[in-house]
Protein backbone atom coordinates (compact mmCIF):
# COMPACT_ATOMS: atom_id res chain seq x y z
CA UNK A 1 0.00 0.00 0.00
CA UNK A 2 1.21 3.48 -0.85
CA UNK A 3 1.92 5.31 2.43
CA UNK A 4 1.06 8.68 0.84
CA UNK A 5 -2.42 7.52 -0.12
CA UNK A 6 -5.50 7.65 2.09
CA UNK A 7 -7.96 4.78 1.82
CA UNK A 8 -11.64 4.36 2.63
CA UNK A 9 -12.41 0.73 3.45
CA UNK A 10 -16.06 -0.27 3.25
CA UNK A 11 -16.67 -3.99 2.83
CA UNK A 12 -13.47 -5.81 3.73
CA UNK A 13 -14.89 -9.31 4.22
CA UNK A 14 -12.94 -10.63 1.24
CA UNK A 15 -9.76 -8.69 2.06
CA UNK A 16 -6.86 -11.00 2.89
CA UNK A 17 -5.16 -10.63 6.28
CA UNK A 18 -1.83 -9.73 4.66
CA UNK A 19 -3.56 -6.89 2.79
CA UNK A 20 -5.10 -5.61 6.02
CA UNK A 21 -1.72 -5.65 7.74
CA UNK A 22 0.01 -3.48 5.11
CA UNK A 23 -2.72 -0.84 4.81
CA UNK A 24 -1.83 2.53 6.33
CA UNK A 25 -3.78 5.79 6.46
CA UNK A 26 -7.26 4.31 6.21
CA UNK A 27 -10.70 4.81 7.64
CA UNK A 28 -13.35 2.12 7.95
CA UNK A 29 -16.81 3.08 6.74
CA UNK A 30 -18.73 0.51 8.77
CA UNK A 31 -22.16 -0.69 7.67
CA UNK A 32 -22.63 -3.56 10.09
CA UNK A 33 -20.53 -5.38 12.68
CA UNK A 34 -17.52 -6.99 11.00
CA UNK A 35 -15.64 -6.95 14.31
CA UNK A 36 -17.78 -9.93 15.41
CA UNK A 37 -17.36 -13.45 14.09
CA UNK A 38 -21.16 -13.67 13.76
CA UNK A 39 -21.54 -10.04 12.56
CA UNK A 40 -24.62 -9.94 14.81
CA UNK A 41 -24.44 -8.17 18.20
CA UNK A 42 -28.12 -8.98 18.83
CA UNK A 43 -27.00 -12.49 19.81
CA UNK A 44 -25.49 -11.11 23.03
CA UNK A 45 -26.85 -9.50 26.17
CA UNK A 46 -26.80 -5.69 25.80
CA UNK A 47 -25.16 -6.23 22.39
CA UNK A 48 -21.83 -6.99 24.12
CA UNK A 49 -20.03 -10.03 22.71
CA UNK A 50 -17.55 -12.14 24.67
CA UNK A 51 -13.94 -11.21 23.86
CA UNK A 52 -13.40 -14.53 22.07
CA UNK A 53 -16.01 -13.49 19.48
CA UNK A 54 -14.19 -10.26 18.57
CA UNK A 55 -12.37 -10.41 15.23
CA UNK A 56 -10.45 -7.86 13.16
CA UNK A 57 -9.63 -5.91 16.34
CA UNK A 58 -6.25 -4.65 15.16
CA UNK A 59 -7.72 -3.59 11.82
CA UNK A 60 -10.24 -1.39 13.65
CA UNK A 61 -7.66 -0.18 16.18
CA UNK A 62 -5.21 0.91 13.47
CA UNK A 63 -7.82 2.77 11.43
CA UNK A 64 -7.64 6.58 11.54
CA UNK A 65 -11.36 6.41 12.29
CA UNK A 66 -14.27 3.99 12.18
CA UNK A 67 -17.34 5.73 10.82
CA UNK A 68 -20.66 4.32 12.04
CA UNK A 69 -24.09 5.00 10.55
CA UNK A 70 -25.94 6.10 13.68
CA UNK A 71 -25.45 6.89 17.35
CA UNK A 72 -26.81 3.45 18.28
CA UNK A 73 -24.43 1.79 15.83
CA UNK A 74 -21.48 3.71 17.30
CA UNK A 75 -22.49 2.79 20.86
CA UNK A 76 -22.64 -0.91 20.02
CA UNK A 77 -19.25 -0.85 18.28
CA UNK A 78 -17.77 1.15 21.18
CA UNK A 79 -19.11 -1.29 23.79
CA UNK A 80 -17.37 -4.15 22.02
CA UNK A 81 -14.08 -2.59 20.94
CA UNK A 82 -13.45 0.17 23.53
CA UNK A 83 -11.55 2.26 20.99
CA UNK A 84 -11.37 6.06 20.76
CA UNK A 85 -11.43 6.28 16.96
CA UNK A 86 -15.13 5.41 16.53
CA UNK A 87 -17.44 8.17 15.29
CA UNK A 88 -21.05 8.45 14.16
CA UNK A 89 -22.19 10.32 11.09
CA UNK A 90 -25.67 10.22 12.66
CA UNK A 91 -27.18 11.62 9.53
CA UNK A 92 -30.09 10.97 7.29
CA UNK A 93 -29.32 8.30 4.72
CA UNK A 94 -31.92 9.60 2.27
CA UNK A 95 -31.55 12.43 -0.22
CA UNK A 96 -34.27 15.04 -0.72
CA UNK A 97 -35.23 13.25 -3.95
CA UNK A 98 -35.74 9.94 -2.14
CA UNK A 99 -37.70 11.65 0.65
CA UNK A 100 -39.95 13.25 -1.99
CA UNK A 101 -40.41 9.85 -3.63
CA UNK A 102 -41.31 8.27 -0.27
CA UNK A 103 -43.83 11.02 0.38
CA UNK A 104 -45.47 10.51 -3.01
CA UNK A 105 -45.67 6.73 -2.51
CA UNK A 106 -47.15 7.22 0.96
CA UNK A 107 -50.12 9.04 -0.63
CA UNK A 108 -50.94 6.22 -3.07
CA UNK A 109 -53.93 3.93 -2.44
CA UNK A 110 -52.93 0.86 -0.43
CA UNK A 111 -53.93 -2.77 -0.76
CA UNK A 112 -54.83 -4.70 2.38
CA UNK A 113 -51.55 -6.60 2.11
CA UNK A 114 -48.23 -6.39 3.87
CA UNK A 115 -44.85 -6.24 2.18
CA UNK A 116 -42.03 -8.62 3.11
CA UNK A 117 -38.48 -8.31 1.80
CA UNK A 118 -37.70 -11.67 0.18
CA UNK A 119 -34.02 -12.08 1.01
CA UNK A 120 -31.71 -15.08 1.17
CA UNK A 121 -29.63 -13.19 3.77
CA UNK A 122 -30.43 -14.89 7.06
CA UNK A 123 -30.32 -11.83 9.30
CA UNK A 124 -33.01 -10.14 7.17
CA UNK A 125 -35.29 -12.89 8.59
CA UNK A 126 -37.79 -13.35 5.77
CA UNK A 127 -38.84 -16.68 7.33
CA UNK A 128 -40.17 -15.13 10.55
CA UNK A 129 -41.88 -12.30 8.65
CA UNK A 130 -43.78 -14.86 6.55
CA UNK A 131 -44.53 -16.94 9.65
CA UNK A 132 -45.90 -13.84 11.42
CA UNK A 133 -48.18 -12.92 8.51
CA UNK A 134 -49.50 -16.47 8.32
CA UNK A 135 -50.11 -16.52 12.09
CA UNK A 136 -52.02 -13.22 11.88
CA UNK A 137 -53.83 -14.27 8.68
CA UNK A 138 -52.39 -11.28 6.82
CA UNK A 139 -52.15 -11.33 3.05
CA UNK A 140 -48.62 -10.45 2.02
CA UNK A 141 -46.41 -9.78 -0.98
CA UNK A 142 -42.85 -11.05 -1.08
CA UNK A 143 -40.68 -8.39 -2.70
CA UNK A 144 -37.83 -10.05 -4.54
CA UNK A 145 -34.52 -8.23 -4.96
CA UNK A 146 -35.06 -5.32 -7.34
CA UNK A 147 -33.79 -1.79 -7.98
CA UNK A 148 -34.14 0.56 -5.01
CA UNK A 149 -36.86 2.79 -6.45
CA UNK A 150 -38.91 -0.23 -7.50
CA UNK A 151 -38.57 -1.64 -3.97
CA UNK A 152 -39.87 1.64 -2.50
CA UNK A 153 -42.70 1.74 -5.03
CA UNK A 154 -43.71 -1.83 -4.14
CA UNK A 155 -43.62 -0.98 -0.43
CA UNK A 156 -45.91 1.97 -1.12
CA UNK A 157 -48.59 -0.25 -2.65
CA UNK A 158 -49.29 -2.13 0.58
CA UNK A 159 -50.69 -1.32 4.00
CA UNK A 160 -47.51 -2.13 5.91
CA UNK A 161 -44.05 -3.65 5.98
CA UNK A 162 -43.24 -6.72 8.08
CA UNK A 163 -39.55 -6.93 8.95
CA UNK A 164 -37.91 -8.74 11.86
CA UNK A 165 -34.16 -8.31 11.39
CA UNK A 166 -31.93 -10.49 13.53
CA UNK A 167 -29.24 -7.83 13.80
CA UNK A 168 -29.51 -4.11 14.49
CA UNK A 169 -30.15 -2.48 11.14
CA UNK A 170 -28.55 0.93 10.94
Where is each model-derived feature located?
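N-terminal pre-catalytic "stem/leader" segment of glycosyltransferase-like enzymes
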Residues: 1-17, 21-22, 139
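Active-site proximal beta-strand in glycosyltransferases
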Residues: 6-9, 22-50, 67
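Alpha-helix capping/helix-boundary segments
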Residues: 13-15, 34, 72-74
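Membrane-proximal helix-turn-helix segments that form the acceptor-binding/catalytic region
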Residues: 44-66, 75
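A short, active-site helix/loop in glycosyltransferases that binds the activated sugar's phosphate group
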Residues: 61-86, 125
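Carbohydrate-associated surface elements
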Residues: 72, 92-93
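Conserved catalytic-core segment of nucleotide-activated headgroup transferases in glycan assembly
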Residues: 93-151
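Acidic donor-binding loop of glycosyltransferase active sites
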Residues: 156-168
Amino acid sequence: ADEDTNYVVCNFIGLREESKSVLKNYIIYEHDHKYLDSRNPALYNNFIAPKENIVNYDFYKNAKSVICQSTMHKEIVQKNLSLDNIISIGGNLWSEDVLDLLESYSKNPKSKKYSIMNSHIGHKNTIDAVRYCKYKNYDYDLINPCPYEEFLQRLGQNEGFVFFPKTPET
